[in-house]
Amino acid sequence: GRWGSFIAWLLDRLHHEVTLHGRKNSASMQRWIGERRNDLIELPESVSLSTELSCMENAEVVVISVGAQDLRALMGEIALLSPKNKIFVLCMKGLEMPHGKRLSVVASEFLSSSNRIAVWVGPGHVQEFYRGIPNCMVIDSEDEKTKHFLVDAFSGGIIRFYYGQDMLGNEIGAASKNVVGIAAGFLDGLSLSSLKGALMSRGTHEIAELIGALGGNPFSAYGLCHLGDYEATVFSAYSHNRRFGEAFVRGSPIMSLRRAMRLHALL
């Protein structure tokens, strides 16, 4: 998808050896192979392309960007390769339905203890990054060395990375901002955009309480994983969640919206 190809583009610019993997039956991957571009950017020849998951076997870091509800199936395929001593970075925001499992928990079910898991969350749209507009994001991991290694390895481009201090809170905050984005779209669709300030204020407070109730640090909700992502989610014309809420309020059928915007789950 757009986010995964952006990450490949970004890490290549940081002089890492990058391979972009996609499924054989993926139309977007076939376009990358045929044209080395999508509607936004062209990938240089220095980025390798592969439809074989075995391409990750020699990688030190595996960055994953798929739909939250697709992670379990992908991790099942990865587990068949018996990876060892790798860092898996999850770059999507959501919870696994129907039980609300955090994505790092899902990934951990398939990996041996020799591997490490990190999350990459925070604001940003690829359309703006490609235009050179910078932003700040968070990398978090239960393993301190992994966290510092990734921030050092991924820094130096158009994203300023911060060290996360609460993996549970950062994952819950990032997933929950999707719901606030949809609510913001409702307000836009009802011509009640002036209420977005109240939505952001009350929404952040309630998500802070949720994080605390789940065992995380409530103050994480006020960081880049949630409140810091509101501009990109609540106001931006690129926000899928906001656009979904606005179109739904104006009468578009929910199933057609989900197909058009590739939204498989809202949280």
Question: What would you call each of these model-derived segments?
Answer:
Residues 1, 23, 66, 91-94, ...:
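Fold-independent oxyanion-binding glycine-rich loops
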Residues 26-31, 97-99, 146-147:
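Short, charged/polar "capping" segments at the starts of alpha-helices
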Residues 177, 184-185, 190, 212-267:
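NAD(P)-dependent Rossmann-like dehydrogenase/reductase catalytic/cofactor-binding core
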Residues 43, 54-57, 61-134, 150:
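Rossmann-like NAD(P)(H) cofactor-binding subdomain of soluble oxidoreductases
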Residues 19-21, 50, 63, 89, ...:
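Hydrophobic/aromatic beta-strand patches that form the interior of the parallel beta-sheet core
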Residues 70, 81, 106, 110-116, ...:
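Internal alpha-helical scaffold of NAD(P)-dependent oxidoreductase catalytic cores
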Residues 1-51:
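NAD(P)+-binding Rossmann beta1-loop-alpha1 motif at the extreme N-terminus of oxidoreductases
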